[in-house]
Amino acid sequence: ACWPYLRATSTGLKSRGINMVTTIYADAFGFDYNTFDEMIRAYCKVPNAINLELSRDKRIKLCKDNHVEGLLVHTNRSCKLWSGFMYEMSRQIGEACNIPVASFDGDQADPRNFSEAQYDTRVQGLTEIMEANKAAKGE
């Protein structure tokens, strides 16, 4: 995440009436374990430890379970694994869920890699597509 820019990212969504309804990280660090083996098993299923297919499928389930209307993806330049397959995974999620996808760049280790203007433009475009999809459905 772009921790130094949480105000900018949350304002960009709030000002457009967009709610963030799910996150992939919620279950990554919120688990209980009693033994070291249980801890290891839990950590082997966090987002950064699984392959593209499992990552995609977890996200598709989250999108469908929460009736997601659009996907906003942060490409974290400090996380090489995710930066490498994030675009393909996002494309597959968009197709499987029939939702628009927008991505923006950032870097948890170097905040200079975040552009508020890029973020705002991407969120604006995503919002326009989501609104057009709603209008086409008569909502």
Where are these regions (language model features)?
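Intrinsically disordered or highly flexible coil/loop and linker segments, enriched in small
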Residues: 5, 68, 72, 132-136
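Acidic-and-aromatic substrate-binding clefts and catalytic sites of carbohydrate-active enzymes
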Residues: 50-53, 79-83, 110-113
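Active-site proximal loops enriched in glycine and acidic residues that flank catalytic Cys/His/Asp
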Residues: 22-25, 75-77, 105-108
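Redox- and metal-dependent alpha/beta enzyme cores, enriched for Fe-S-associated oxidoreductases
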Residues: 1-60, 64
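C-terminal hydrophobic structural anchor segments
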Residues: 56-97, 102
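Peripheral docking tails and interdomain loops at the edges
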Residues: 87-139
